[in-house]
Amino acid sequence: MFRILIKKYLHESILLWCALALVLFFFPWVRIWTVSQFELTGFAPLIEQFKAFEKFAPVPLEQFLTYHGIIGITYDEPVVLLCVLTWCIARGTDVVSGELNRGTMEMLLAQPVKRSMVLASHALVTIAGLGLLCLLIFAGLYLGIHTNSTPVASASKLTLPWLEWTINNPFTPKQMQNVPLNQLVKPQEFIAATMNLFSLGFAVLGLGVMASSFDQYRWRSIGIVISIYVLSLLLFILSKSTPSMGIFKPLTFLSAYQPAWMIQQIHNHPERQWYLSNAQHAKSWQETIGPMGYVSILMLLGLAAYSVAFWRFTKRDLPAPN
């Protein structure tokens, strides 16, 4: 029966997954191609105009003048977040309240199947789908880095006679040379950020399943999860507005989604990629947690929400179909 439930949830979600997979694979690739058409140092005057907004950025704005920094923004792009959240909210809220709303839950539970098996099979399909979507994002980044080159300004060299010193020639203008991106950026620097995106999706998915397990109407479950996310986003923005508002930062789970900061840390210190704690190198309270620490926080939130959902669904009395 477990295999039949797996097939049922695969059939229900395959079209949505394929549509999102198409976007999440090609968007990073196209974005990297677009970025690679420009020499980044030319954007320095533009970046200076946004210095007043630097407090809202997860890293110093100068980071966006580096190729690993500008590519890392992919994980904060609205398109990427919208696709991942669409999968998590749409599929998470469907498992209980969706079936009740459609009047199909009674028919499903009339079969020789435990309630926990319904949630477990749905979780397996949905979490696997989320993992594959995140892998496709990384695959798009990997191919974008390995199939594109970018113009880089390089000065001609001048060798001083007798001294055998080589210096930049001040009498000739800098020349533009196309350099493969894979010589400037290492794809493995984005592994932790990809895991952070997966953990964010898992946390939202857990919240969706938990809301669904308590409710009868899917539209209300969707509204609850979106409200929680928007409230967390507002608290996150508020916490960055002024130092006195920093007290709100621990109150939002979005504080644990830090892909740009992770990429910066890993680029400068590759050995810290798998750190749970970064306290010995921390310059602020945010840096006391390592990349895997942030991933673990979101994963624990998702597991806690799933645990509540399993408990509630196995204990509740199901309402009669409308």
Regions found by a protein language model. Name each.
Residues I71-G98:
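Long, hydrophobic alpha-helical segments
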Residues I89-L109, A123:
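Transmembrane helix boundary and interhelical loop/hinge segments in multi-pass membrane proteins
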Residues E12-S13, V30-I71, I167-M176, S221-S227, ...:
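Terminal transmembrane helical anchor/hairpin motif
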Residues M1-F25:
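Aromatic- and glycine-rich beta-strand/loop motifs that create alpha-glucan
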Residues H68-V80, A120-Q216, G290:
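Secretory targeting signals
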Residues C88-G92, G206-L207, F253, V308-A309:
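Hydrophobic/aromatic residues in alpha-helical transmembrane segments
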